[in-house]
Amino acid sequence: MNMTFDNYEFSEPVKITKWEPPESRGLYVILEPDLYSSPLPLKPIYFGQTGNFAERGFIKSHEKYKDWTREVVKKEHLFIAIYLMPGSTEEERKAIETELIAKYQPVCND
């Protein structure tokens, strides 16, 4: 089941340890389990944008990776969902990223 954030339809969440990044640009959301969220029991803890999901070390070398793992008991409990934006500019992606951060106020976007 895909997830929608502010009318942007993100992919179905996948455990971050099982994720295979595509060669594309877009937005991503890092999620953690939350029994009170619906329709899926996951809540956003970080929104970001990238020019290439498949960039070497994209997840583990991210400056906020340690913050994400501190939010969950095990890193296996981290999920990722993406919103593909092929052909987009960094400016376009950052505008949507800023909008989503303002609306959802995830704990790891500071």
Listing of model-derived features with the role each one plays in the protein:
Residues E55-L78:
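A broadly used, surface-exposed interaction patch
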Residues M1-F58, P86-I101:
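GIY-YIG nuclease catalytic motif and its immediate N-terminal context
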Residues N7-Y8, W68, D110:
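Short linear motifs in intrinsically disordered/low-complexity regions
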Residues V14, V29, V72-V73, V107:
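Extended aliphatic helical segments
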Residues P13, E20, E63-Y65, N109-D110:
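Generic structural signal for short, solvent-exposed loop/turn connectors between secondary structure elements
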Residues I101-D110:
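Intrinsically disordered, low-complexity regulatory tails
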Residues A81-L84:
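Canonical phosphoinositide-binding patch of PH/PH-like domains
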